[in-house]
């Protein structure tokens, strides 16, 4: 059986001598079978080099401990480096799984891309143990097109400017619970915004005729025998009520007093 080392799968980064001397194949054969071994190593090397997160050299000057209670403090610390703000990382004193103690100890004693490689291996081993696909590229996303056709051009609202159905509804502003939100549609072709269509108010002749016919029947069954309301009296003259006063000019003679 050919020996497989981390250095044989890394073309850009050179691993340390301690990890390079470790037979990774023999270590992984304790957890997974040979059928999944090659794919797991290849996947771990690809993802660790692609999604490698650079570890920051934390010192006392840029490290601040968490202010949580002791029972809730899981040992998270973050770096206040100006280039990498709030870069969270876990401290190595967190209790690890005893089943993978050998691999966990190797992760604690390494750094850089080799540490990321071992972490991906540990994740893949746990997924294989549970019968779950570890490679996210092979997981098929669920398609809900049969249930929701909101963004389907067949059902979209046509644009009044260019008559295209390549439109998207957007909620511009949310209001109170008893008020409708402000919704606008955006056309991707002509880059115009327009209001959503409204329902037109129309009369249903069948319902109106039926309601009138029903009212006639009710009138015939229960006739209105109440007396008619009295006629409204004529409004009083404002002059008689004294609301309007007779005015005269100063040059005119004063009005005669009534005897």
Swiss-Prot record:
GO terms for molecular function: DNA binding; DNA-directed RNA polymerase activity; zinc ion binding. Its main location: virion. Induction: Expressed in the early phase of the viral replicative cycle. The keyword Acetylation does not apply. It catalyses: RNA(n) + a ribonucleoside 5'-triphosphate = RNA(n+1) + diphosphate. Keywords: DNA-directed RNA polymerase, Early protein, Host cytoplasm, Metal-binding, Nucleotidyltransferase, Transcription, Transferase, Virion, Zinc, Zinc-finger. It is found in: Virion; Host cytoplasm. This is DNA-directed RNA polymerase 30 kDa polypeptide.
